[in-house]
Amino acid sequence: ISMISAHILSAAGLILLAFLPEAFADPFVGLLVSVTVYAIGGGLLEVLVSPVMESCPSDNKEKAMSLLHSFYCFGQVGVVLVSTLFFAAFGTGSWRILALIWAVLPIVNAVMFTKVPIGSLIAEGERGMTARELFSSKTFVLLFIMMLCAGASEQSVSQWASAFAEKGLGIS
């Protein structure tokens, strides 16, 4: 259910991105709400995909996990290329349509995940931590803060690299 919810949130955020900015007096509020929704979905996906992959029966888990983690980069390049081609063909004024087109991918994934049998990583007879136990763990809090800072750093570098490339290539 978590994987399906993550895909639904990702799709919902992208769909909201196409419509919500016009619904507010200040379009930034609509953008902020939309981005928050799809960021929650994307963040959940980033955290949940690895354990799902780990639970899949495979002869070579290391190879599969390595391939999985490389697809984040491939996906980023693919999104940039497809979006650039879309904008070249239809103009940047069609960005709302592009958001709706990108929303199709998580919708299809959500539907596909409803048919996937997922095994539990917790052994039979054992129980996982409750939410209260997890959030009161100092180790969890420390790792959560580290992941938050790492994500912020990653996004900062990503945005800087994009701005640098736009300025350097003269396409901004």
Residue ranges of model-derived segments:
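Small/hydrophobic positions within alpha-helical transmembrane segments
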Residues: 9, 37, 67, 71-75, ...
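Extracytoplasmic gate region of multi-pass secondary transporters
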Residues: 136-172
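C-terminal ends and interior cores of transmembrane alpha-helices
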Residues: 8-25
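Cytoplasmic helix-loop-helix junction between adjacent transmembrane helices
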Residues: 34-70
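Helix-loop-helix hairpin linking two adjacent transmembrane segments in secondary transporters
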Residues: 59-60, 67-121
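Juxtamembrane intracellular "pre-TM" segments in multi-pass secondary transporters
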Residues: 118-143
